[in-house]
Each structure stands twice: as structure tokens, then as C-alpha cells.
Amino acid sequence: MKNVVALILAGGQGTRLGVLTEKIAKPAVQFGGKYRLIDFTLSNCVNSGIYKIGVLTQYKPHLLNQHIGIGKPWDLDRKDGGVTILQPYYTEKKGVWYNGTADAVYRNIEFVDDYNPEYVVILSGDHIYSMDYNELLDYHKAKSALATVACMEVPLSEASRFGIMVTDLENRIIEFQEKPKQPKSTLASLGIYVFQWSFIREVLIEDAKNDQSSHDFGKDIIPKIIQTERVFAFPFDGYWKDVGTIYSYWESNLELTRPIPPFNIHDENWRIYTHSKEMPPAYIADSTKVKNSLISEGCEIYGAVSNSVLAQGVEIGKGSIVKNSVIMSNVRIGENCYIENAIIAENVVIGDFVKIGVGEFAESKLNKKVYNSEITVIGMDSIIESKVEIGKNCVVGIDMIVNKNLNSGEYI
């Protein structure tokens, strides 16, 4: 689409993912064995024919920038368009950090102006879904809208986590509440917007002048423009997941191991592209038992794996058992280990006779809001020495060496 530019907001820290985002931005977190979260939004763009893309980064962007590079895996290494990493920078008027989602777009007006598009699509870089943005744009045009917000129904119990909208019979948005304590509906914004560029450009310029604004699309821009302009809700009935918590991240990964998963990463008509290492095929020894699991390239499995997701280059030693767990790339698990209900981040080394996820559940002594399930999380580049036992709902930070037992709920 020659008259469309996509801007992907990828600067989020993802604090609710705890140690998983201590070293990297949330969109760079691995998902589904071989992907990173941003791959799904980038793939949606190119599958929809959008090849002019800006990725707005901020928090710990190094790994994310390295992953995207010049965009070759997504066919974005091109002279006309392609992908551009847009990091915050100093100007004569502004400091270096983006001060909200709307401010991030405002500070990159010149990038969009260079393409002189009719439409701009604003997207989040950390959600799991497949969407043909052509359908969204066609709907936007049919409604003669100045802005369109993709939305879906959510359970009332979850509505306060979202931007919630009230619409009329034509799906025109007449009220918008950002994460309300008492939601008036269950129609939730997915953080996916289409705007007429000439319109939103002026709105952003005016918003930047307002010292009382938080410069956020959900809190400021959408509530303001619905008062006078044609802003519509686009109902989306496909799979969409915000994997913003430890539990939702773990659950969404394990959903992929079902015989018929709710989200299809194997769809030949809507491929998910990624930048991954060239590795040999996985090796599964004759003594191994593997059931309902995703096993990525370069894995060597000598133990038993069930209902788990293994990223590239994972090694599991003889006699070890891995159940209901997400194991990220280049993790080394020794012999005779037992691991259940765990998320183990990249480059972790686990010795022999280690037990993880055992015992009775206990509340987290680190952060009850972030760590509130039976899932134990091991941060990147840590070492768990042989014969260590770690309970349920435990946390091991990044770059740690663990040589003592942790009871359920404890952290190091």
C-alpha cells in the first residue's frame, strides 16, 4: 500500500513481565519457540502489503534493534520504504525520552512526512495476533472516518485493564475510558489505530503544546477527538493476546502445544517471519519421550519433555524431565533434573539433579502483583548449580549464580 505508513510502538519496558524484561524491551521477548513478540506485528504489516514502517524504540533497545536490523527476514530491506528504527533524540525543544505514545509519534512527524501518506497505522509491538490491515483500512474508508480503533469484546472482569469504548448503532465511538475502575462496556481497544495523516498530524501538534496532557492516545487523543470528529470502532473477532503478565505469557506459549491451538503459527497463507540463527535440525535421542511440545532447531533432547515450548539451541540432559514450561534459546539443562511450570530465559545454565517448581505454592516475597502464580521464572544468563531445589513462584534475577535452595515464593 503506497499511501500507508505504519508506526510500531516498541519502546515499552513491560514491567509486569518482571525479570524477563530486565535486560531487554518487551517486544524483544521470545515467544513460541523461534519468534520474538515484535515479529507478529511486523509480519502483519508485510502480509498486508505495508512496506513503509517505523519502529519506535526506547527502553533497552539493543537486542530489539539487532533483531530487526535492516528488515531482511520480512522483505523490508528495500530502497523504497522498508523498516526504520526510530529512537528518541534531543532537539532544541525536547529532551531525549518519549513522554507517551502520542508524543512518540509527534516526535517522528518528519519521518512520516517524508512519505506523504494518506493514512498512518499506529500499532503496538508486543501483542500476539494475526490481522489483515487491509480490512481495517477498507472499513475506515467505508465509514468516511478520520480515525478508527480496532476493538474486541472482553470479559467484564478484565475490562479495567483496557481502554473501553461506548459506540452507537453505526459503531461510532461516543465515549472512551482509559482503564476505568467501573467500565461502562466490555468493548476494549486493542491499541491498533488508523488515522488520516493530515488530520492526526495537526491533532498531535496541538497536543504537544498542552502541558496538561499526558500525550497518550488512549488517555488524551481518542477521548478528545471523539467529541467532534468521526471516530469508529472496528470489531475484530480473531485471536488477540496481550502477553503482558507472567501468567498470560506462560499460558499463551503453552496454548501453542495443543493439538488444535487457538492461534495458528503454522498458517501457510499468513506466515510469521523472524530473524533467527541458522541451526541444524533438532536431535531427539532414542531414550527420549516428547509429547505435545514445540521443539525448535538446534535442540538436543536426551530427557522427557511434555506440554512445553523449547526455543533454539536448548539442551536437555539424560534423565531430566521438563513439564509445562517455556524454555528460551541456548538454555543448558543437565542430567536428572525436574522442571515444571517454569519460564527459563535465554542462556541459562542448569546443573545436574536440579529441581525447579516443586513444593507448595507460597506468595511472592519480591512482588505479589507481578509474581502471583505457581510459575517460577529464571532470568537471562543465570547459572543454577547442581543439586539446587527451587520452589513454586520463585524468581531468579538476571546474571545470578544460585548455589542454595529457594523455598516457594523466595527470590534471589
Swiss-Prot record:
<dbReference type="GO" id="GO:0005524">
    <property type="term" value="F:ATP binding"/>
</dbReference>
<keyword id="KW-0808">Transferase</keyword>
<dbReference type="InterPro" id="IPR011831">
    <property type="entry name" value="ADP-Glc_PPase"/>
</dbReference>
<dbReference type="InterPro" id="IPR011004">
    <property type="entry name" value="Trimer_LpxA-like_sf"/>
</dbReference>
<comment type="function">
    <text>Involved in the biosynthesis of ADP-glucose, a building block required for the elongation reactions to produce glycogen. Catalyzes the reaction between ATP and alpha-D-glucose 1-phosphate (G1P) to produce pyrophosphate and ADP-Glc.</text>
</comment>
<feature type="binding site">
    <location>
        <position position="98"/>
    </location>
    <ligand>
        <name>alpha-D-glucose 1-phosphate</name>
    </ligand>
</feature>
<dbReference type="InterPro" id="IPR056818">
    <property type="entry name" value="GlmU/GlgC-like_hexapep"/>
</dbReference>
<dbReference type="InterPro" id="IPR023049">
    <property type="entry name" value="GlgC_bac"/>
</dbReference>
<dbReference type="Pfam" id="PF24894">
    <property type="entry name" value="Hexapep_GlmU"/>
</dbReference>
<keyword id="KW-0321">Glycogen metabolism</keyword>
<dbReference type="GO" id="GO:0008878">
    <property type="term" value="F:glucose-1-phosphate adenylyltransferase activity"/>
</dbReference>
<keyword id="KW-0320">Glycogen biosynthesis</keyword>
<comment type="pathway">
    <text>Glycan biosynthesis; glycogen biosynthesis.</text>
</comment>
<comment type="subunit">
    <text>Homotetramer.</text>
</comment>
<feature type="binding site">
    <location>
        <position position="189"/>
    </location>
    <ligand>
        <name>alpha-D-glucose 1-phosphate</name>
    </ligand>
</feature>
<dbReference type="InterPro" id="IPR005836">
    <property type="entry name" value="ADP_Glu_pyroP_CS"/>
</dbReference>
<feature type="binding site">
    <location>
        <begin position="178"/>
        <end position="179"/>
    </location>
    <ligand>
        <name>alpha-D-glucose 1-phosphate</name>
    </ligand>
</feature>
<feature type="binding site">
    <location>
        <position position="163"/>
    </location>
    <ligand>
        <name>alpha-D-glucose 1-phosphate</name>
    </ligand>
</feature>
<dbReference type="GO" id="GO:0005978">
    <property type="term" value="P:glycogen biosynthetic process"/>
</dbReference>
<dbReference type="InterPro" id="IPR005835">
    <property type="entry name" value="NTP_transferase_dom"/>
</dbReference>
<keyword id="KW-0119">Carbohydrate metabolism</keyword>
<dbReference type="Pfam" id="PF00483">
    <property type="entry name" value="NTP_transferase"/>
</dbReference>
<protein>
    <recommendedName>
        <fullName>Glucose-1-phosphate adenylyltransferase</fullName>
        <ecNumber>2.7.7.27</ecNumber>
    </recommendedName>
</protein>
<keyword id="KW-0548">Nucleotidyltransferase</keyword>
<comment type="similarity">
    <text>Belongs to the bacterial/plant glucose-1-phosphate adenylyltransferase family.</text>
</comment>
<keyword id="KW-0067">ATP-binding</keyword>
<keyword id="KW-0547">Nucleotide-binding</keyword>
<dbReference type="InterPro" id="IPR029044">
    <property type="entry name" value="Nucleotide-diphossugar_trans"/>
</dbReference>
